[in-house]
Amino acid sequence: MEKKAVHFGGGNIGRGFVAEFLHTAGYEVVFVDVMDSIITALQNTKSYEVTEVSDEGEATKTITNYRAINSKTHESDVINEISTATVVTCAVGPNILKFIAPAIAKGIDARTAATPLAVIACENAIGATDTLHHFIKDNTAQDRLGSMPDRARFANSAIDRIVPGQAADSGLNVRIEKFYEWAVESTPFGEFGHPDIPAIHWVSDLEPYIERKLFTVNTGHATAAYYGYNAGKKTIAEALHDSRIRGIVRDVLQETASLIIDKHEISAAEQQEYVETIITRISNPYLEDTVERVGRAPMRKVSRKERFIGPASQLAERGGKFQSLLGSLEMALRFQNVEGDEESVELAKILKENAPADAAVRLTGLDRDHPLFPHVVKVVDGVQSDAK
């Protein structure tokens, strides 16, 4: 019987990262989305192309063997597909997980297969599958919760691949960097074993992979974006061509490296090599990635467990240095009223209407007695003072 994966999110990451590797692994992919335009395009097209870009050139793969369902109008079809699938993945954004959970819960509840469904959230957030699992349990009858592990297993993942903004006329085709990393927990699958997806690096402990990725790739990428935006740069490559900004990114990643090395017992040499790889990757001019795209959704990016406050708070607790991370936070807080970015508008409103300490709590989620908190308040106060 053919393997089937149901994937929520027909966007660039869904088509260009997750679906590409599911397709390569021999799965039929069923895309689920609420965007009429994406679903219609997928339904009316037999294939699309994923072009991997590197300094060595380009390589194009053709993706076929997929279907698409609009969950807004055909939820029962989505439930039926999940009930007979091998894998469910998603790349919808952490804030959307609660909206896709009801259909997944119903699909899981309808399963009769001997092997449980593998559920893997592919989001830029720590513990995203745990979050989705929580929402699914909220949408499952109490008397069915105890037997849910017979029907589904949930594994957190760490994904790493840069998907830049796409050309307006690209249609379903996706340009994407060649490099990728997709690490997924293996332990939740127990005696059933994990699904067969060669692109996945199966690990027993995911936290080192998630934190190393989030606090290096995402921290460095966002730092370049926010400093670049405030310096009038157009692309990430242009920002990193500026020796001042490149030096700042290195300083920030030196701080996060000290945390990663100390906490996860990764060698300094290995982490330094990883940092150099990341800086080379995000400097790639062929990706043509804009500072606005990488910087979008600043409120999520300055939140408690994210790329700035996450490492800075842990460094503060350990007595480490976090001054450069505070600089990144400041630049992120100056990413206000950017066209097409609702969070940047809301950010400006919060900073305008709240006292520094109140704004710091609301934006970062830090407790007022946390050792990092007074330093964050000082940054917020400085940004607010400049706006007066």
Swiss-Prot record:
InterPro entries found in the cross-reference section: 6-PGluconate_DH-like_C_sf, 6PGD_dom2, Mannitol_1_phos_5_DH, Mannitol_DH, Mannitol_DH_C, Mannitol_DH_N, NAD(P)-bd_dom_sf
EC number: 1.1.1.17
Residues involved in NAD(+) binding: A5, V6, H7, F8, G9, G10, G11, N12, I13, G14, R15, G16
Catalytic activity, reaction form: D-mannitol 1-phosphate + NAD(+) = beta-D-fructose 6-phosphate + NADH + H(+)
An example molecular function term from Gene Ontology annotations: mannitol-1-phosphate 5-dehydrogenase activity
Biological processes annotated in GO: mannitol catabolic process
Active site, renumbered: K213
Alphabetical list of HAMAP family matching this protein: Mannitol_dehydrog (MF_00196)
Record's protein name: Mannitol-1-phosphate 5-dehydrogenase
Organism: Penicillium rubens (strain ATCC 28089 / DSM 1075 / NRRL 1951 / Wisconsin 54-1255)
